[in-house]
A protein has these predicted regions:
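Metal-dependent de-N-acetylase/amidase catalytic core
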Residues: 2-4, 86, 92-269
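Active-site rim/loop-helix segments in enzyme catalytic domains that contact anionic ligands
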Residues: 1-108, 142, 236, 248, ...
């Protein structure tokens, strides 16, 4: 049986900075890995305002960066929803859900990964695309739900949230002062670690972290957002990346219990 993994994120770089090692590992093992990206990152500029290439051009730059990244990670497919960076939470929810359902039914993944309810650090785009994806998983399995291409229903076996555990956050916190976390509705948002006991799945992908680092560096326009981490030695960065690979199993139709998984496809035959 072909194993298919679909990731659904908001911006170019979410995939590699969040789970690049995991994606590289599964691609190397022959899993078909796919990415649905909600936007093209048109507002993600971290340089001087004078050097800003502008809304449309930056979107083109980041699209090319993401295309280079998914090639580095060995991913099979890349698909854009073409919402505007920063406005994903304003998208028509029915339309967004239908778009994702169409991709789910076409790709037929056993496993989907998206953002947790807090969007990892409160970014409204992250939160929105996570909510849309949760709804799309339900709708994709409903034979009475008609998507944009009228495809047959598909039931996803497992849905995961990409999360950051306490150990990882404690390691990177000293570098976070230089990172820009969003202010939303007058409130400063930021990274909140998942307690280690909450993590249901830990993927050992350390040997693939140099691939993940090359993929991250494809997002050249975004490297300033990493602050001091971007200037660390490669071995130090890959050691940090190796502490990712932590996920929360939001639901599974095939397994459960407290035993920590070492594979997103545990129970799938």
């Amino acid at each position: 049986m072909n194993r298919n993994l679909l990731t659904v994120f908001a911006h170019p770089d979410d995939e590699s900075m969040g789970m690049g090692g995991t994606l590289a590992k599964y691609a190397a093992e022959g899993v078909e890995t796919h990415l649905v990206c909600a936007s093209r990152g048109e507002r993600g500029w971290f340089g001087s305002e004078e050097a800003n290439p502008g809304f449309e051009r930056l979107g083109q730059i980041r699209t090319q960066e993401l295309e280079n990244c998914v090639k580095e990670l060995g991913m099979r497919g890349l698909y854009f929803l073409d919402y505007i960076d920063g406005d994903v939470d304003q998208a028509d929810h029915a339309e967004a859900i239908s778009k994702i359902v169409t991709h789910i039914r076409r790709i037929q993944p056993q496993v989907i990964v998206t953002f947790p309810p807090d969007g990892n650090y409160g970014h409204p785009d992250h939160i929105a695309i996570g909510q849309f994806t949760n709804a799309a998983v339900v709708c994709a399995a409903d034979s009475s739900y008609q998507d944009l291409e009228d495809l047959p229903s598909h039931r996803v076996s497992k849905l995961y949230y990409m999360v950051d555990g306490e150990n990882y956050i404690n390691l990177v916190t000293p570098f976070m002062d230089e990172m820009d976390f969003p202010i939303v509705d007058g409130q400063q948002r930021g990274e909140v670690a998942w307690m280690e006991w909450m993590i249901t799945t830990r993927i050992d992908m350390a040997e693939h972290c140099h691939t993940a680092l090359r993929a991250i560096r494809c997002h050249e326009s975004q490297l300033p957002s990493l602050g001091a981490i971007a200037n660390m030695h490669d071995d130090a960065i890959t050691a940090v990346l190796a502490m990712q690979g932590t996920f929360y199993r939001a639901f599974s139709l095939i397994n459960g219990g407290r035993e920590v998984e070492s594979d997103l496809f545990t129970g799938i035959r």
